[in-house]
Every structure is written in structure tokens, then in C-alpha cells.
Amino acid sequence: MSDQQHSAPQNAAATASPSDSPEAVEATMAAHAADELGRLQNELAELKAKSADLADQFLRAKAEAENARRRADEEVSKARKFGIESFAESLLPVADSLTAALAIKDATIEQLREGTDATLRQLTSALERNKVLAIQPGAGEKFDPHQHQAISMVPAEQEPNTIVSVLQKGYVIADRVLRPALVTVAAPK
């Protein structure tokens, strides 16, 4: 409230002439007080309306944030549940090939070998399409503990801590090691 608003009743008394009766001065002050009261009530009503509007906006924003969080949780859940769908679809031809191979009653060893090779190519292709790549280091490569697991150290005519042989391939998916390659490593001399 400004100084001007506080001084309104006092100004009413000051503007009253000395010839005015105390009742007239009192009536003038009451009229000014009533005007001030009306103005304050209007201001209060405006502030209450503004407060109610802000409270409503807050509740709407809160509800929207909660809905966004819930939608994000649902999307994460769906991604976990169906994220493997593409990978599973790429493995179906492999399963079909194995089923067809088992259905052949009198297959020769050559037919089995050709079928197995074709199935392995299908499997390798499915893995590569899904960013699953083999870790298959060559002999003489430097041992990398992040991608290789040393099974043993053997004396060898090569530089120490280099790979002598690969016992089992490893695999990575998008720079994350699924399984390290099992290797033997050249022992220090």
C-alpha cells in the first residue's frame, strides 16, 4: 500500500473545513475508508484469482511432467521387452536351416558338412547385422586384457606378452566385450 493510500483518511480530515461538524468530518473519513476498503477488496479478489490461476497452472505442469515420466518409463520397458526382436528375427533362418537338416534321414557326411557351413554363414551374418563381431586375434598380436583372456603362458620364440594361439573366439557388441577371446600368451624369457 502506498503512502498516498495511507494518507487518504487523514487528507479527508485535513480537507474538511473548520466549520464542518465532527459528524461531517467523520462521514467524510468513513466514505474515504469505504472507498479504500472497496479498492483493497478488489485488489484482494484479483490476487486470489491470480493465485488460483497459478495453482492451476502448477497442477497442470505437474500432471504433464508426471505423464511424460510415465511415457518415458513405458518406452524404456518396451525397448527392453522388444529390443531383441530384430536380433531374434535374424536368427530364425538359422533355426529353419537346422530343422531342415534334421529332417533329412539319410544325409551323407558331405551334405551335413555343406549344410553346417551354410548354417554357420547364416549365423555369422545374423550376428554381424546386429553388431556382434568376433574377436579373433592373430598369433604375435599384443595381448589386450580388455579383449583377451589368457588361459596359460607358454615358452615361445616370440615377444613376451604376445598371443601364441587362440583357443576360442571372443565377441564384442558395439564396443562392449560379450566374451573375451581365450588365448595362450608367450611367457617372458
Curated annotation (Swiss-Prot):
| Keyword set, alphabetical order | Chaperone, Cytoplasm, Stress response
As for subcellular location, the record says: Cytoplasm
One of its GO biological process terms is: protein folding
Output compositional bias ranges, type Polar residues.
1-20
Q: What is its main location?
A: cytoplasm
Q: Does the keyword Transferase apply?
A: no
Please give the GO cellular component terms listed in this UniProt entry: cytosol
From which domain of life does this come? Bacteria
Gene Ontology MF term list: adenyl-nucleotide exchange factor activity; protein homodimerization activity; protein-folding chaperone binding; unfolded protein binding
Region Disordered, residue ranges = 1-29
Q: Where are the transmembrane segments?
A: none
Q: What does this protein do?
A: Participates actively in the response to hyperosmotic and heat shock by preventing the aggregation of stress-denatured proteins, in association with DnaK and GrpE. It is the nucleotide exchange factor for DnaK and may function as a thermosensor. Unfolded proteins bind initially to DnaJ; upon interaction with the DnaJ-bound protein, DnaK hydrolyzes its bound ATP, resulting in the formation of a stable complex. GrpE releases ADP from DnaK; ATP binding to DnaK triggers the release of the substrate protein, thus completing the reaction cycle.
Subunit details for this protein?
Homodimer.
What NCBIfam families does the record point to? PRK14139.1, PRK14140.1
- Entry's family note: Belongs to the GrpE family.
Report what the protein is called: Protein GrpE
Q: What high-level taxonomic lineage is stated for the organism?
A: Bacteria, Pseudomonadati, Pseudomonadota, Betaproteobacteria, Burkholderiales
